[in-house]
């Protein structure tokens, strides 16, 4: 079910929203820099949990319904680690670009 180079459509669309919203883009970039440690795997895991918790907090509170079941099903499909790694790679690229420019 790969989609546009991502694990699946759900992961792609969550990342698309994060990348296309400047406030979210900056927020998760700052969060990633805080989470980065010597072990990138640990940073990916910690960042993925933080992102998932925030997105879960933003979900609308719905009564039990077909829509809630569909929303929960889609959220379970998101590969949060993949999104976290993408953000970490992005900030690494940005930092390298800044170093080279100076």
What are these regions (language model features)?
Residues 1-102:
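Acidic interaction surfaces
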């Amino acid at each position: 079910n790969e989609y546009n180079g991502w694990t699946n459509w759900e992961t792609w669309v969550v990342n698309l929203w994060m990348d296309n919203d400047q406030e979210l883009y900056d927020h998760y970039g700052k969060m990633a820099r805080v989470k980065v440690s010597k072990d990138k795997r640990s940073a990916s895991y910690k960042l993925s949990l933080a992102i998932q918790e925030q997105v879960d907090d933003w979900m609308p509170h719905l009564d039990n319904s077909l829509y809630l079941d569909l929303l929960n099903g889609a959220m379970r499909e998101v590969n949060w680690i993949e999104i976290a790694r993408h953000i970490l790679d992005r900030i690494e690229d940005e930092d390298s670009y800044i170093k080279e420019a100076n």
